[in-house]
Amino acid sequence: MIQTKSRLDVADNTGAKSVLCIKVLGGSKRRYASVGDIIKVSIKEAAPRGRVKKGEVYSAVVVRTAKGIRRGDGSLVKFDGNAAVLLNAKLEPIGTRIFGPVTRELRTERFMKIVSLAPEVL
């Protein structure tokens, strides 16, 4: 469960290491984001020669949450931390690699690219 001011790790090779959620997209009163939701983020920590710079604002999709996601069969998939993948204006991933597992809930038409790049889909 991600909200404004939440810190997330970055699960791609754009050069960003840590981001801060500045807005949950999808309605004026929307408070929380879960796996598969799009958020606006500010880069808080970045590698020196990465594609992105500290302070820049991007869209991102949440790929892992510590809160977890409930499946239809009653099982719950949780992770150790929160992570996101940075997106460009067309909502395509900026990076060319994804690190760590992602959930099956990302398997929609919008995020098939992320699922195909991920080393493991839970």
UniProtKB/Swiss-Prot annotation:
Name the domain of life this protein comes from: Bacteria
An example molecular function term from Gene Ontology annotations: large ribosomal subunit rRNA binding
Question: What GO CC annotations are associated with the protein?
Answer: cytosolic large ribosomal subunit
InterPro entries linked: Ribosomal_uL14, Ribosomal_uL14_bac-type, Ribosomal_uL14_CS, Ribosomal_uL14_sf
Annotated CDD domains? Ribosomal_uL14
Database matches in Gene3D superfamilies: Ribosomal protein L14
Record's keyword annotation contains Transport: no
Q: Which GO terms describe its biological process?
A: translation
List the SMART domains. Ribosomal_L14
Alphabetic keyword roster: Ribonucleoprotein, Ribosomal protein, RNA-binding, rRNA-binding
PANTHER family linked: 50S/60S RIBOSOMAL PROTEIN L14/L23, LARGE RIBOSOMAL SUBUNIT PROTEIN UL14M
Q: What does this protein do?
A: Binds to 23S rRNA. Forms part of two intersubunit bridges in the 70S ribosome.
Assembly notes: Part of the 50S ribosomal subunit. Forms a cluster with proteins L3 and L19. In the 70S ribosome, L14 and L19 interact and together make contacts with the 16S rRNA in bridges B5 and B8.
Record-linked HAMAP family: Ribosomal_uL14
Name the protein family: Belongs to the universal ribosomal protein uL14 family.
Tell me what this protein is called.
Answer: Large ribosomal subunit protein uL14
